Amino acid sequence: MLVIHTRIAPQAAADAELELTFEARRKSRLRCFTTAGEEVGLFLERGQPALADGEFLQAKDGRIVRVRAKAEPLLHVTCASPFELMRAAYHLGNRHVALQLGDGWLRLPDDYVLKAMLEQLGATVEAVQAPYQPEQGAYGGGHHHSHHGDEEFNYGPRLHQFGVRK
């Protein structure tokens, strides 16, 4: 089993690739397989942002592993005007839906209820299979509700590191 604990800076080449859905890339502990079929155990630091498409990891044996976002069922949303697209994003955000933002479009996980809502708002909604890389949000630490005695799970907010969008 390839055991991975470490995220590293971008590399020129990789020894293996992991192709993972967004939900899998959010996990700090995961059993998965490389694209070549080798078993992998991910043991990453908890409370960190999801693995991004193109991110690199280093296995305990020194091998370099590239992460690829796996195509998954999404809704691709466009609108007749920027205002209507902004309105659609507002209503999705009001429902705490993670969104991937593009120039003139939004993407979100396929959901028939949200699709119907978007169509009622006048949006054009198309089902697609594509890699999913939603925005991390302004605080990047996720959504937590700690209770008495759960202090070790109360991760404080961290300002998002805004990067260049592709």
Swiss-Prot record:
Keywords: Chaperone, Cytoplasm, Nickel, Nickel insertion. Its main location: cytoplasm. The keyword Oxidoreductase does not apply. GO terms for molecular function: nickel cation binding; unfolded protein binding. Residues 135-156 are annotated as: Disordered. HAMAP family: UreE. Belongs to the UreE family. This is Urease accessory protein UreE.
